[in-house]
Amino acid sequence: MADNPVLEQLLRRLEVADGGLDSAELATQLGVEHQAVVGAVKSLQALGEVIEAELRSTKCWELTTEGEEIAREGSHEARVFRSIPLEGLVQSELMQLPSGKVGFSKAMSNKWIRVDKSAADGPRVFRVVDSIEDEVQRRLQQVQAGQAEKLAEKERNELRKRKLLTEVILKTYWVSKGKGFSTSVSKQEAELSPEMISSGSWRDRPFKPYNFSARGVLPDSGHLHPLLKVRSQFRQIFLEMGFTEMPTDNFIESSFWNFDALFQPQQHPARDQHDTFFLRDPAEALQLPMDYVQRVKRTHSQGGYGSQGYKYTWKLEEARKNLLRTHTTAASARALYRLAQKKPFTPAKYFSIDRVFRNETLDATHLAEFHQIEGVIADHGLTLGHLMGVLREFFTKLGITQLRFKPAYNPYTEPSMEVFSYHQGLKKWVEVGNSGVFRPEMLLPMGLPENVSVIAWGLSLERPTMIKYGINNIRELVGHKVNLQMVYDSPVCRLDIEPRSSKTQEAA
């Protein structure tokens, strides 16, 4: 191995050494990086029993970047002291110096300087002593000289507190002769090439033994985002509970399906531009089920089905406005309308997981674009009790047991409830879902029988993902600030099924 001078020097010195060599000391003697000696040691280890190498760990002290600067130019407090002339210096000017803020407080603590607040031009700083000894610089230089152990523990701790000194673990090898030691070693071949086979040279060459315990190089592959991992678990839970997935391919939705079909009045604040993204082109939906539209119009403006309605002039042009859907309940309305056209009525359970869009302020728990999970059950005689039972079962399957229910208002559900879960990272209760029983004013115009009730709930995909993976800021989960290493390292999502506990279900 004539092409490796460090390895040759190691063998020569080991031949005459008494007992063995320390890799760090050898690196210093040879004037090379320690890693070069370590590489030579590992190369010799791969040859068999040429050497024996024992890995040793030693605590040592190193200067930080700031510590090296101070060892070279002096401490901040010493620099402040030297910058003050005999006639003193205005404090405001002193604070503008590179070492002013840190050095001033330390110099005051050392009683090297004083402040005269009665000076005519403002507080002025004067020297108290004629000369100083920069002990901080001296101690750091002592560490540089390899004499850190001579410092008192209190002195080292003070330097560490000021982030001038850091403790590191130095890993070295104690190298000694092996059973097959020789100063003349040859390189072992790692691969059998076609040329060796054709020429027959493989017969005379030493080959490196296979290491069947070594871990191979992992192939490059794609990584699922935590949202997709949690989404697959939610989808599996819905399928286990007997739900059918709804089509949700309408990112662009008409105001009719997004609002009017849900018995949400056209003057509702949620329909304002401050909450909704309206489209400029195409601005209007051209095709709507006009028979159903007329029934919805009559329910809004005149009432019916036991309701007084909203008593306002309902406008078709308002219902035609296109927007980015604000919730997947629009997809639920379409699914329920299709269900109502099938005779006779058959109970159904639907779910969807897809993107929705809200024109709202971004913060640690809100995005303008996020995923909504929605579950819908249509059957005869469903009540709020059925809804709470399903929610309890659903969230238990998610492994979320710290729940609170809070009465709420939705234009299209009555009664309505918000669902809260305790977020361990944020140390507060966060809303994870909304739920309720769809109003007759929404269901009956679709053509559903009068004795059919529909219970539904929705929640975002992002917040349960944050709870599962311990993420405190939603912008660390979605957006340009996402750390791709987090995506690579996130484990497979397993939403543990935990036993029910009435203590975890609290009414807010």
UniProtKB/Swiss-Prot annotation:
Q: Where are the transmembrane segments?
A: none
User: In which domain of life is the source organism classified?
Assistant: Eukaryota
Protein's cellular compartments: Cytoplasm
List every position bearing Phosphoserine: S193, S301
CDD domains found in the cross-reference section: PheRS_alpha_core
Q: Which top EC class applies here?
A: ligase
Homology family = Belongs to the class-II aminoacyl-tRNA synthetase family. Phe-tRNA synthetase alpha subunit type 2 subfamily.
The subunit field of the Swiss-Prot or TrEMBL record says: Heterotetramer; dimer of two heterodimers formed by FARSA and FARSB.
> What is the protein named?
Phenylalanine--tRNA ligase alpha subunit
